[in-house]
Amino acid sequence: MRLLGAAAVAALGRGRAPASLGWQRKQVNWKACRWSSSGVIPNEKIRNIGISAHIDSGKTTLTERVLYYTGRIAKMHEVKGKDGVGAVMDSMELERQRGITIQSAATYTMWKDVNINIIDTPGHVDFTIEVERALRVLDGAVLVLCAVGGVQCQTMTVNRQMKRYNVPFLTFINKLDRMGSNPARALQQMRSKLNHNAAFMQIPIGLEGDFKGIIDLIEERAIYFDGDFGQIVQYGEIPAELRAAAADHRQELIECVANSDEQLGEMFLEEKIPSISDLKLAIRRATLKRSFTPVFLGSALKNKGVQPLLDAVLEYLPNPSEVQNYAILNKEDDSKEKTKILMNSNRDNSHPFVGLAFKLEVGRFGQLTYVRSYQGELKKGDTIYNTRTGKKVRLQRLARMHADMMEDVEKAYAGDICALFGIDCASGDTFTDKANSGLSMESIHVPDPVISIAMKPSNKNDLEKFSKGIGRFTREDPTFKVHFDTENKETIISGMGELHLEIYAQRLEREYGCPCITGKPKVAFRETITAPVPFDFTHKRQSGGAGQYGKVIGVLEPLDPEDYTKLEFSDETFGSNIPKQFVPAVEKGFLDACEKGPLSGHKLSGLRFVLQDGAHHMVDSNEISFIRAGEGALKQALANATLCILEPIMAVEVVAPNEFQGQVIAGINRRHGVITGQDGVEDYFTLYADVPLNDMFGYSTELRSCTEGKGEYTMEYGRYQPCLPSTQEDVINKYLEATGQLPVKKGKAKN
């Protein structure tokens, strides 16, 4: 056997403890990181990666191992803080207590002289915006799957997000040491559920309690991980009983890559045997095109398979120069046609600086803004401009972050991720070093909130702390919305799920000393129409002197079901009956009037306002006239329309032991769920269903009760659809009671 890590063995031989060895290696690499960050590292020596997965797949544990093996930390800690410390990447006290990652912690490290920027992202669906932000600014990703759970609910969400931002990724099937681990099933699910051309790069030597190591199918050798912390990597011959399986899997790998890479495909057709370098280059090309997904294996908790994964990040994921990033040039004439400009990835100051603020955070260092640099050079002391607000900012400090610790740097170049201090901006803002450049990076996709609760401080004297905390959270998280309900005199907070809002309530108490009282959760219902309805509305007001006059004619149309959350405005006018400068006023009136629907007081959506004709007055017509005309036209159309209420439908995934299958299905049916699929492994089954969010409250308690605490579930927002007649009637009656109105007339609502 050829042995790597001779220095480690020598150190152990001299009686040095593994922890001290880790400390020594940490010192060396820490200096390497500092030295590298101050010099201009070439693009080839940089990787910007994210680690994403379903909740509890082992992302944070994997990141902790990566930081240990690369010398960034001296000791490894367990995620749930059983040792009183908690994982390094879980820097918030709440994260260490719960054992889930809430915010994406950013860090950087070195592996084989390559600088790796890592974002560790939350797996819980309520924190999806963190994953969106991470993937928007990264060049590659590692998707972590659980060998037992396989492809789960949040895995599909992350997969969609990676597709949206065209992020190449590797897959790491984790937890091969667990009972019921089945990497072959996970691979099959990747192919069937995610529709990926995926193949094993490694196969395991044993599974569950017998998991000893892995076989590298490219190099055709066995890899073992020795030492107390798996820090000694040994290479050896493939065990005799696994040689046939290894040969079969290697052939399958070559076929999968040949199907997606032209050069290897030609070699395959000519029956040439590809060399190791041929195969690696083909895998790299196919991975960068997202036409092939390499699959790696291991167990982060048992310290197996992490170092080969790090090698693969260097080998197969892109450097900043291999990814095309575009900025949008916003023209002054406000035309809808946008010009895309390709960013230059050269790590010098030959091009103007362009960067995207993708995360805001208020920590012990003050207001932090995480920025991904896409072009040019950024120096401490530079003046940069926010293209959205036009404000200029002078950089006092520039830093690189390691979870909640930081390191000052003098410069940052294209491809770097850094933190700025004291910058007034919002998530998604673009910064340049030239005023009025008109450039902006494509904005981060922000999903609409689906749940709301009323919240107020327990103590009236804490109002200042409450508003300060709420203000900070809304700046940090675009999916956390706040508004004041003037009718009920309540502060309403909205977010992506119960856990999302619960976490913020707890953070107010912990970080601001402001315990809060929360009301019952309220679902974000919407109202829409079921068929097109015409309108012909004239707004006229005469009160002496110049009056107001605006006439609009057109039709209000329902949008397709997939666009139920949108509002559209279409100008189909000809001539000058409505002067073009007044058309935006009609649109504003329409959008303002959609804030509150007539049936239940919820927002109107899924509508298209088609403006076809109208009239104006030479003296009395002005902007406010057509705003009022737009509002009146919508109200007139709604009075003649058949309305229905839309509700959010959640994609629910339940995992429980087989003996409780009947109770679980009955529970989902009781909650008006539609079962969309089933899966099973060993003694557990997985149920997939679409369930109205309004019917999911209290489900965690019911599931624990009917499965003796052995069942668990996850859910994510799926779509909006018309709610059941009974639900619609209930929602309308509650609104009428709350507003003191008379009962609604029969036939007003669609039953």
UniProtKB/Swiss-Prot annotation:
<feature type="modified residue" description="Phosphoserine">
    <location>
        <position position="91"/>
    </location>
</feature>
<keyword id="KW-0007">Acetylation</keyword>
<keyword id="KW-0378">Hydrolase</keyword>
<feature type="binding site">
    <location>
        <begin position="53"/>
        <end position="60"/>
    </location>
    <ligand>
        <name>GTP</name>
    </ligand>
</feature>
<dbReference type="InterPro" id="IPR041095">
    <property type="entry name" value="EFG_II"/>
</dbReference>
<dbReference type="InterPro" id="IPR035649">
    <property type="entry name" value="EFG_V"/>
</dbReference>
<dbReference type="InterPro" id="IPR027417">
    <property type="entry name" value="P-loop_NTPase"/>
</dbReference>
<feature type="modified residue" description="N6-acetyllysine">
    <location>
        <position position="175"/>
    </location>
</feature>
<keyword id="KW-0342">GTP-binding</keyword>
<dbReference type="InterPro" id="IPR009022">
    <property type="entry name" value="EFG_III"/>
</dbReference>
<dbReference type="InterPro" id="IPR014721">
    <property type="entry name" value="Ribsml_uS5_D2-typ_fold_subgr"/>
</dbReference>
<comment type="function">
    <text>Mitochondrial GTPase that catalyzes the GTP-dependent ribosomal translocation step during translation elongation. During this step, the ribosome changes from the pre-translocational (PRE) to the post-translocational (POST) state as the newly formed A-site-bound peptidyl-tRNA and P-site-bound deacylated tRNA move to the P and E sites, respectively. Catalyzes the coordinated movement of the two tRNA molecules, the mRNA and conformational changes in the ribosome. Does not mediate the disassembly of ribosomes from messenger RNA at the termination of mitochondrial protein biosynthesis.</text>
</comment>
<feature type="binding site">
    <location>
        <begin position="174"/>
        <end position="177"/>
    </location>
    <ligand>
        <name>GTP</name>
    </ligand>
</feature>
<dbReference type="GO" id="GO:0005739">
    <property type="term" value="C:mitochondrion"/>
</dbReference>
<dbReference type="InterPro" id="IPR005225">
    <property type="entry name" value="Small_GTP-bd"/>
</dbReference>
<dbReference type="InterPro" id="IPR000795">
    <property type="entry name" value="T_Tr_GTP-bd_dom"/>
</dbReference>
<keyword id="KW-0648">Protein biosynthesis</keyword>
<dbReference type="Pfam" id="PF00009">
    <property type="entry name" value="GTP_EFTU"/>
</dbReference>
<keyword id="KW-0597">Phosphoprotein</keyword>
<feature type="transit peptide" description="Mitochondrion">
    <location>
        <begin position="1"/>
        <end position="36"/>
    </location>
</feature>
<dbReference type="GO" id="GO:0005525">
    <property type="term" value="F:GTP binding"/>
</dbReference>
<dbReference type="Pfam" id="PF00679">
    <property type="entry name" value="EFG_C"/>
</dbReference>
<dbReference type="InterPro" id="IPR004161">
    <property type="entry name" value="EFTu-like_2"/>
</dbReference>
<protein>
    <recommendedName>
        <fullName>Elongation factor G, mitochondrial</fullName>
        <ecNumber>3.6.5.-</ecNumber>
    </recommendedName>
</protein>
<dbReference type="GO" id="GO:0003924">
    <property type="term" value="F:GTPase activity"/>
</dbReference>
<dbReference type="InterPro" id="IPR020568">
    <property type="entry name" value="Ribosomal_Su5_D2-typ_SF"/>
</dbReference>
<comment type="pathway">
    <text>Protein biosynthesis; polypeptide chain elongation.</text>
</comment>
<dbReference type="Pfam" id="PF03144">
    <property type="entry name" value="GTP_EFTU_D2"/>
</dbReference>
<feature type="binding site">
    <location>
        <begin position="120"/>
        <end position="124"/>
    </location>
    <ligand>
        <name>GTP</name>
    </ligand>
</feature>
<dbReference type="InterPro" id="IPR000640">
    <property type="entry name" value="EFG_V-like"/>
</dbReference>
<keyword id="KW-0809">Transit peptide</keyword>
<dbReference type="Pfam" id="PF14492">
    <property type="entry name" value="EFG_III"/>
</dbReference>
<dbReference type="InterPro" id="IPR031157">
    <property type="entry name" value="G_TR_CS"/>
</dbReference>
<dbReference type="InterPro" id="IPR005517">
    <property type="entry name" value="Transl_elong_EFG/EF2_IV"/>
</dbReference>
<dbReference type="InterPro" id="IPR009000">
    <property type="entry name" value="Transl_B-barrel_sf"/>
</dbReference>
<keyword id="KW-0547">Nucleotide-binding</keyword>
<dbReference type="InterPro" id="IPR035647">
    <property type="entry name" value="EFG_III/V"/>
</dbReference>
<dbReference type="GO" id="GO:0003746">
    <property type="term" value="F:translation elongation factor activity"/>
</dbReference>
<keyword id="KW-0251">Elongation factor</keyword>
<dbReference type="GO" id="GO:0070125">
    <property type="term" value="P:mitochondrial translational elongation"/>
</dbReference>
<feature type="domain" description="tr-type G">
    <location>
        <begin position="44"/>
        <end position="321"/>
    </location>
</feature>
<dbReference type="InterPro" id="IPR004540">
    <property type="entry name" value="Transl_elong_EFG/EF2"/>
</dbReference>
